[in-house]
């Protein structure tokens, strides 16, 4: 009480108020102001929830282009494993997704010969060291695929490599030493092929700092179209671990070969030749020169099919790929680049309503789910067909529920549900008014017109009038591949 009285007298002197008047004012104050603040009962012992902080790349629609990866190391003393900082795709952490571990980004390069350019270099390493390390990191991928990588020193390259700092033009700033090490962008994105390394990291060759080889090889995997994987010891694992020597895991290899196929074997020594002496046994093998695709303006085609909305022309083991009427870069290419184990040449091809792709050769057929083989070789007799091969296959109708097989002057209707032709006795192609009696290939366009190819010519069939349009046949080369118009054009 004595202490309170002293305090009141001090306040009274400070405010120049008589003590009785000060006591009166205190009695008139509301009781809420005189009570000590205390938390509500239901919050007193409740722990504070901490909201996790998401990386910018984890926020949907927050950036113009989502990068393929950020390598994020923790402090050396931390027990948390070092990892790539971009959130993993949901399937990567799905416990049910065990058989196929590798995850694709949804994009891939449409050619196999890629160029790269290094714009700026880290200060810790001489330029030649960086060039050798980048080449070695790319070689990890080229050794198991048909991909090749060539360094260029000016202009725009397919893969642009840069060592940069903080804000550098892609809304994904670096953060100085530690933290984010690098990021890369997938194919078919706004910044496809860009690979950025944080200039402020301690870049080294080996485990005495941040190993450039390990990080570069991982980022190049993203640039080629691979996402993260949960497979143990995979280079594309989101967790950063120094490994020596650097190599791909079986999961990495399966993923990249799913996108680009296996490497093409070429002789590395002078080509051996067979002995010219008749009857002489020899174990020398005469290796053929690498095949070259036929001249598109001068060839006929073995098969044509609309696959995933794009037009594929097949000839002698090669394929031409047209999207919106334009031949895509990197084509013609070997058909085995997309469909491993596919025989050459194919006689016919079509895509059914479920997206499965059927190929025919001789008395057998194969079925692929995208680029994954699911059936074959299987005999044509399984489909109710006997005798000689199918020459052409046509998917007709908006729902892809009408499939026709052509052979010579005959045709059959095939039912995907029963996996059989409706009648083993064929009908005559004269039912298709104006179509030649024998055809090489057939397909349907997005507007419902059917096309029949024979030799260098094609016929366009009207589904409403049920006959070939006037002014046909037309030459294939000028209309599909911008070849010069022949002098004897059919009009």
From Swiss-Prot:
SMART domains named among the record's database cross-references: HX, ZnMc
What organism is recorded for this protein? Rattus norvegicus
* Alphabetical keyword list: Calcium, Cleavage on pair of basic residues, Collagen degradation, Disulfide bond, Extracellular matrix, Hydrolase, Metal-binding, Metalloprotease, Protease, Repeat, Secreted, Signal, Zinc, Zymogen
Q: Where is the composition biased (Low complexity)?
A: 263-277
So where does Zn(2+) 1 get bound?
168, 170, 183, 196
Gene behind this protein: Mmp11
Q: Where in the cell is it found?
A: Secreted, Extracellular space, Extracellular matrix
Which GO terms fall under molecular function for this chain's record? metalloendopeptidase activity; metallopeptidase activity; zinc ion binding
- Signal peptide feature range: 1-35
Q: Which cofactor does it need?
A: Ca(2+); Zn(2+)
Which Pfam families does the record match to this protein? Hemopexin (PF00045), Peptidase_M10 (PF00413)
| Domain free text | The conserved cysteine present in the cysteine-switch motif binds the catalytic zinc ion, thus inhibiting the enzyme. The dissociation of the cysteine from the zinc ion upon the activation-peptide release activates the enzyme.
Tissues and organs where the protein is expressed, per its UniProt entry:
Highly expressed in ovary and uterus.
Q: How is the cofactor bound?
A: Binds 1 Ca(2+) ion per subunit. Binds 2 Zn(2+) ions per subunit.
The entry's comment on post-translational modification says: The precursor is cleaved by a furin endopeptidase.
Database matches in InterPro entries = Hemopexin-like_dom, Hemopexin-like_dom_sf, Hemopexin-like_repeat, Hemopexin_CS, M10A_MMP, MetalloPept_cat_dom_sf, Pept_M10_metallopeptidase, Pept_M10A
* Disulfides per UniProt: 297-483
Q: What is this protein called?
A: Stromelysin-3
């Amino acid at each position: 009480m004595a202490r309170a009285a002293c305090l009141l007298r001090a306040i009274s002197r400070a405010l120049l108020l008589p003590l009785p008047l000060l006591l009166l004012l205190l009695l008139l104050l509301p009781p809420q102001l005189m009570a000590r603040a205390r938390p509500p009962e239901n919050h007193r012992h409740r722990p504070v929830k901490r909201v996790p902080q998401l990386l910018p790349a984890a926020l949907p629609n927050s950036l113009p282009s989502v990068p393929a990866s950020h390598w994020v190391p923790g402090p050396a003393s931390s027990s948390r494993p070092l990892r790539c900082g971009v959130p993993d795709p949901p399937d990567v952490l799905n416990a049910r997704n065990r058989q196929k571990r590798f995850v694709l980004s949804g994009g891939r390069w449409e050619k196999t010969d890629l160029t790269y350019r290094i714009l700026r270099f880290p200060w810790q390493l001489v330029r030649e060291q960086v060039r050798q390390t980048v080449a070695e990191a790319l070689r990890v991928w080229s050794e198991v695929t048909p991909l090749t990588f060539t360094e260029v020193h000016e202009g725009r390259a397919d893969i642009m490599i840069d060592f940069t700092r903080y804000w550098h033009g892609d809304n994904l700033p670096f953060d100085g030493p530690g933290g984010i090490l690098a990021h890369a962008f997938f194919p078919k994105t706004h910044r496809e092929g860009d690979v950025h390394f944080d200039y402020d990291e301690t870049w080294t060759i080996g485990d005495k700092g941040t190993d450039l080889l390990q990080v570069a090889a991982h980022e190049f995997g993203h640039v080629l179209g691979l996402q993260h994987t949960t497979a143990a010891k995979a280079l594309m694992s989101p967790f950063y671990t120094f490994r020596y020597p650097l190599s791909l895991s079986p999961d990495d290899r399966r993923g990249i070969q799913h996108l680009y196929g296996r490497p093409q074997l070429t002789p590395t020594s002078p080509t051996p030749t067979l002995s010219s002496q008749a009857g002489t046994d020899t174990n020398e093998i005469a290796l053929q020169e690498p095949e070259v695709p036929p001249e598109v303006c001068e060839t006929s085609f073995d098969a044509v099919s609309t696959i995933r909305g794009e037009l594929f022309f097949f000839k002698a083991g090669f394929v031409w790929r047209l999207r919106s009427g334009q031949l895509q870069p990197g084509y013609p290419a070997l058909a085995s680049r997309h469909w491993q184990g596919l025989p050459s040449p194919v006689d016919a091809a079509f895509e059914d309503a479920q997206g499965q792709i059927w190929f025919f050769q001789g008395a057998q057929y194969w079925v692929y789910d995208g680029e994954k083989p699911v059936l074959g070789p299987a005999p044509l007799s399984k489909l109710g067909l006997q005798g000689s091969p199918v020459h052409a296959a046509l998917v007709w109708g908006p729902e892809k529920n009408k499939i026709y097989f052509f052979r010579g002057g005959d045709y059959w209707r095939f039912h995907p549900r029963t996996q059989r032709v409706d009648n083993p006795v064929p009908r005559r192609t004269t039912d298709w008014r104006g179509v030649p009696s024998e055809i090489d290939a057939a397909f349907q366009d997005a507007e419902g017109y059917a096309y029949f190819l024979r030799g260098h010519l094609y016929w366009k069939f009207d589904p409403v009038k049920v006959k070939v349009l006037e002014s046909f046949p037309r030459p294939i080369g000028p209309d599909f591949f911008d070849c010069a118009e022949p002098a004897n054009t059919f009009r």
